[in-house]
Amino acid sequence: PRVRRQRQMCIRDSIEAKAKEQGLEIEFDIAKSLAKQSNSCSLKIYNLSKATADKLERADTICILEVGYSQDAGLKRIFIGWVTDCYSYMSGSDKVTEMKLYDGHVAIRDSIVSLSYAKDVSRKKAIDDVAADMGLVVTYADDCEFTTFANGFSFVGAGRECLDKVCAGTDLEWSIQNNTLQIIKQGGNTNVQAIKLTPESGLIGFVEKLLKGPTKAAKQKTSKKTTQPKRDKKAGWNVKCLLQPVLNPGDLVYIDSQEIKGWFKIESLKHNGSYSGQNWYTELEVYEIVPKE
């Protein structure tokens, strides 16, 4: 059984200096999804060293949080993000530092791209170039397909808006996961079969069926092709398990419970952890994989 927890925080500033903090009491709440907004992390650290606390006050500071189990695969990256808010206060005899982190924050907020291509250029080429300009590594699901710009393509503006435009024309969707640009099919998945969850491997309690009506986006008529209404037809479930840092939205997870059994797509997740406390859980919103009609 995986009972011995591990944690580590790494601070990296704009000049690539690094400071690692281990052995501290930490608490975190992480929310990740396939939305184009940044994933977020609320992090609380007790008795952080002054040197590391000073680094957190610098512009463009990146915080990397790793957690895991010493009797399993050890430390795994659970979140990487830019510090947008940070403050410290005394609570009894403890100095508490609270911060808010956002994944891909600088890339989404600041990146301006200028691209121009001749006719018949692949949309993959455009995505690769946008990712490079945004300072992001890009990963593609292995079933992604790319059309071309028959009449060429040019764009000047925010990188995120360029990604919207390029992906919309080839039935793809993008998100940023751990500072990596993730590209999958609209309504698809990464095809990464992450883990298998059973009561013996960390599944907790009963899975809960999700009852959702059509989203507002599904009701609106747009000129762009969208598969969002189809996604609403799939059966969804809320699943709780022991903390699983390797899981990301878009991945596949195998669930073996009394209620459901099979592979499901992770649409969103929340990690909640307290190193010395009771919380050390992951909550998943998953959907069954339905063949295309």
Language-model segments: which ranges?
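Single conserved hydrophobic/aromatic residue that forms the stacking wall/gate
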Residues: P1-I11
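An acidic/polar, Gly/Ser/Thr-rich interaction patch typically located in mid-to-C-terminal regions
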Residues: F28-L56, G187-E293
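Solvent-exposed, acidic/flexible segments
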Residues: L56-R58, K76, S116-K124, G152-L163, ...
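Extracytoplasmic/secreted envelope proteins and their assembly/folding machinery
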Residues: I80, K124-D128, R160-D164, G236, ...
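Short beta-strand-centered interaction patches in the first periplasmic/extracellular domains
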Residues: D94-V106, D133, V137-G213
